[in-house]
């Protein structure tokens, strides 16, 4: 961890798992590790995504990250719903990912199971941009519910960003947005690469713990 020069942000409170969640987590980790065994660059082919709320008056931010860097931030002016997320995907997320990786790249796109990500009108655009390669609720690849410890958005990006954004004490919404944008720009790309390349070891720890939460046992 010291060699990589980045800090792992471990949630203080574990999200309780349902009875069948460990099995779903095992399935996902096994799928990921099998893909990595077949393709040594597979860790570089996933875009991880999520929203987070930054507090002043509650700024909702979407970002995506991959081993190549960050996409976003994009700001929502109100609570995220299916329509606003669909618009963001069509106008920004899909085009930005295509710009980053190229038209013909075999790229995977991950999103969690939040209700806006499950909007009935979103599936067709997802299938069009990422045919059989999007990861999420009822997608071609299921992302396990209640698993923030398996996505670098939660175990890395949001904690890192909030620490750095709040350290500069922005006092207005506009100042907060500018600081979020600046901090996103300032994250070096090799940090994203290192975080994404660390996922294999993290997922192996999950398997070693039979799909149960494992961060409390990290050394």
Language-model regions, residue ranges each:
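Surface/interface recognition patches
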Residues: 1-219
